[in-house]
Amino acid sequence: MDIHNKARIHWACRRGMRELDISIMPFFEHEYDSLSDEEKRIFVRLLQSDDPDLFNWLMNHGKPADAELEQMVRLIQTRNRERGPVAI
């Protein structure tokens, strides 16, 4: 997926679990443009993960084996925590 195709990435952020939508969509909407191209590539790669894996990682019930994905999960958690609750 092209890191500059924001419409497609936005669609990929929409998941089958509300808990994931609450974590991923605000991060995309508020933070994606400020990421480096490399971070954008990693974020897009993270979106290719299965919902149960994403849920477990974002809820701290495990972590990805891939160090880059683990770093992106931590970044999502940190930025969401700093920003606070966002209405969906």
Swiss-Prot record:
GO terms for biological process: succinate metabolic process. The keyword Cell inner membrane does not apply. InterPro entries: SDH, SDH_sf, SdhE_FAD_assembly_factor. It is found in: Cytoplasm. Monomer. An FAD assembly protein, which accelerates covalent attachment of the cofactor into other proteins. Plays an essential role in the assembly of succinate dehydrogenase (SDH, respiratory complex II), an enzyme complex that is a component of both the tricarboxylic acid cycle and the electron transport chain, and which couples the oxidation of succinate to fumarate with the reduction of ubiquinone (coenzyme Q) to ubiquinol. Required for flavinylation (covalent attachment of FAD) of the flavoprotein subunit SdhA of SDH and other flavinylated proteins as well. Belongs to the SdhE FAD assembly factor family. This is FAD assembly factor SdhE. It comes from Salmonella typhimurium (strain LT2 / SGSC1412 / ATCC 700720).
